[in-house]
Amino acid sequence: MRASWVANRQGKSNVSQLHFARQGMITEEMAYVANRENLPESLVMEEVARGRMIIPANINHLNLEPMAIGIASKCKVNANIGASPNASDVGEELKKLELAVKYGADTVMDLSTGGVNLDEVRTAIINASPVPIGTVPVYQALESVHGSIEKLSEEDFLHIIEKHCQQGVDYQTIHAGLLIEHLPKVKGRLTGIVSRGGGILAQWMLYHHKQNPLFSRFDDICEIFKRYDCSFSLGDSLRPGCLHDASDEAQLAELKTLGQLTKRAWAHDIQVMVEGPGHVPMDQIEFNVRKQMEDCSEAPFYVLGPLVTDIAPGYDHITSAIGAAMAGWYGTAMLCYVTPKEHLGLPNPEDVREGLIAYKIAAHAADIARHRSGARDRDDELSKARYAFDWNKQFELSLDPERARQYHDETLPADIYKQAEFCSMCGPKHCPMQTKITDKDLDDLEDVIKSKDASKINL
């Protein structure tokens, strides 16, 4: 779809959506997003130019269907997939991608760390994906030197970052905000550093006694990104890994640096979103969102969860969806899903489905709470179908039609029950929706009430 759009951009020094928006140009990607979001094209261009919206759209990802991440657009959901040294293969990851797209993932991150040819997996995912693909390049940088921190050079990082851009990655998590002077602030935490990328860079700095290479070479990364329109997802290496560590000095020190890096990227006309926690008590979620908006000049916020309790392994898609709904309500632009396997193991395709549906619910609830245009239309249509006992339409309008139909049919599988005015919960005689009290009935009742002494009818 995008081949003709990007043909005349190849070879230019800066092909980012932000660069074009600041020149007053409405690109094909901006127009496409405006149509998807039911927003004026001029507003999309203005939000991109301001940095409050990004359109992750690498010029080498030709089958991409452009989408927007920002407070003016609907709240988005990312799904993580990826192979590990202990499990998965290319076919398994493509199956996860297919399921993620089927159940509404707006973007997908390939977090493969080993066990497969990382370039082969990534290329296959990009070629098969209509949604933006994100990566964390430090994983492959470490893998390229066989896990040897002492052999990992600044040039190794830059080489892998450009390779990902060349392959068509739309956004990359760059852990540039973790500075060597931040590391002592981790003392006293219960769970230390829980970011894999942040952990790699912390080890690198501790071994070499040098500043984070992603920070010191940040301008070089910008020069790479602008040639491909790869967006920054500025990683939060010091995100809290438990409630005890939330909103601590280490997290907030890094956030301040992420705000500075946001402005440096914008100076190069590079699109930026900023990643956030993590594990956060419910009463601190609003503070975290407001603080990010303040420190990062309203660049889109992209949070992992956050989990609002630490005691539910196996159910962390629920503990985190609670926090995600709140974060979305307060203005977070994209939610990174958490699966039931979080903290326990590598997700399988069914875990991907469970996590994604939980997060689509959270994002949709946030859109309703923020009164986004048309956000509640589907809810109202489903409610009408429910009141009319139109079971098939209820299934069709559900976020997960297969699950809704499955649960209904467990007790009433025959087709005749798709027209029945009851389900197995209340049975044929006790469903309150059978009452069908009409507006005319209520109008007539009002007339009766007005015509009688209120005391006689116990009002």
UniProtKB/Swiss-Prot annotation:
Binds 1 [4Fe-4S] cluster per subunit. The cluster is coordinated with 3 cysteines and an exchangeable S-adenosyl-L-methionine. Transmembrane segments: none annotated. Its cofactor is [4Fe-4S] cluster. It catalyses: 5-amino-1-(5-phospho-beta-D-ribosyl)imidazole + S-adenosyl-L-methionine = 4-amino-2-methyl-5-(phosphooxymethyl)pyrimidine + CO + 5'-deoxyadenosine + formate + L-methionine + 3 H(+). Keywords: 4Fe-4S, Iron, Iron-sulfur, Lyase, Metal-binding, S-adenosyl-L-methionine, Thiamine biosynthesis, Zinc. Its EC number is 4.1.99.17. One of its GO terms (cellular component) is cytosol. Substrate binds at residues 80, 109, 139, 175, 195-197, 236-239, 275, 302. Zn(2+) binds at residues 279, 343. The keyword Metal-binding applies. [4Fe-4S] cluster binds at residues 423, 426, 431. Pathway: Cofactor biosynthesis; thiamine diphosphate biosynthesis. The keyword DNA repair does not apply. Catalyzes the synthesis of the hydroxymethylpyrimidine phosphate (HMP-P) moiety of thiamine from aminoimidazole ribotide (AIR) in a radical S-adenosyl-L-methionine (SAM)-dependent reaction. This is Phosphomethylpyrimidine synthase.
